[in-house]
Amino acid sequence: MIIYKYGKIMHVNTNYLILDHNGEGDLIYAPNISRFKKDELRKIFISQIENEYTKVTYGFDNFKELVIFEDLIEIQGLGPKTAISILNIGWENVINYVATANKGALGKIPYVSSKIANAIIFSYQDKYAKFMKKLTSDEAAKIKVPASSENENKFLDTMKMLGFKQQQIKFALDKIELNDDIETCVENAIKLISQQQHETSRV
């Protein structure tokens, strides 16, 4: 089994490159194609998918990205093209979304249905949670926290600091729409909680 090829990149297109390896030109499809530069000498990790009709080579920047690709295509209904689409967001983000069961973020990726997002999380959440703990500082720095998650974390921290209970915070969070104006969100949440307490006391 060939794990990687080393050679000179002769051409880069929107979703594939041509690698000159031992005098042969290999056409390789790759995620985040902008990472690969024409005339660059480099190692490319590969996965070859072969059936009775075609043989297609997919290429990756590093071994970890290759492993995640191989994991993804094990999911029923998830083919190589969808796996490449998923990896276009960065393999570091993929394992983060799966480890944290962020179905919403996965579902926003082209060609990823709710069913597929659930299947990925079900199959690999535990594995990728362990994977997350072993990331280097450079790899961890590439993880993008969705704005909504960041806002939610700020909101939760503020509400807890103000002394509200988890149940009260959840009640407010279900009712309001979070945005970058955390102060206003907190004010609205306090009003909702106060109204709820007032209504409860009247019963």
From Swiss-Prot:
Region Domain III: start-end pairs: 147-203
Chain residue ranges for the region called Domain II: 62-139
Region (Flexible linker): 140-147
Residue span of region Domain I: 1-61
GO biological process: DNA recombination; DNA repair
Subcellular localization(s) per the UniProt record: Cytoplasm
Keywords of this entry: Cytoplasm, DNA damage, DNA recombination, DNA repair, DNA-binding
Pfam families: HHH_5, RuvA_N
A molecular function (GO) term: four-way junction helicase activity
Alphabetical list of SMART domains matching this protein: HhH1 (SM00278)
Listed GO CC annotations: cytoplasm; Holliday junction resolvase complex
InterPro entries cross-referenced by the UniProt entry: DNA_helicase_Holl-junc_RuvA_I, Hlx-hairpin-Hlx_DNA-bd_motif, RuvA, RuvA_2-like
Gene3D superfamilies hit by this protein: 5' to 3' exonuclease, C-terminal subdomain
Superkingdom of source: Bacteria
Functional summary from the UniProt entry: The RuvA-RuvB-RuvC complex processes Holliday junction (HJ) DNA during genetic recombination and DNA repair, while the RuvA-RuvB complex plays an important role in the rescue of blocked DNA replication forks via replication fork reversal (RFR). RuvA specifically binds to HJ cruciform DNA, conferring on it an open structure. The RuvB hexamer acts as an ATP-dependent pump, pulling dsDNA into and through the RuvAB complex. HJ branch migration allows RuvC to scan DNA until it finds its consensus sequence, where it cleaves and resolves the cruciform DNA.
Family: Belongs to the RuvA family.
Comment block on domains: Has three domains with a flexible linker between the domains II and III and assumes an 'L' shape. Domain III is highly mobile and contacts RuvB.
Listed NCBIfam families: ruvA
Subunit structure: Homotetramer. Forms an RuvA(8)-RuvB(12)-Holliday junction (HJ) complex. HJ DNA is sandwiched between 2 RuvA tetramers; dsDNA enters through RuvA and exits via RuvB. An RuvB hexamer assembles on each DNA strand where it exits the tetramer. Each RuvB hexamer is contacted by two RuvA subunits (via domain III) on 2 adjacent RuvB subunits; this complex drives branch migration. In the full resolvosome a probable DNA-RuvA(4)-RuvB(12)-RuvC(2) complex forms which resolves the HJ.
Protein name: Holliday junction branch migration complex subunit RuvA
Organism, scientific name: Metamycoplasma arthritidis (strain 158L3-1) (Mycoplasma arthritidis)
High-level lineage: Bacteria, Bacillati, Mycoplasmatota, Mycoplasmoidales, Metamycoplasmataceae
Gene that specifies this protein: ruvA
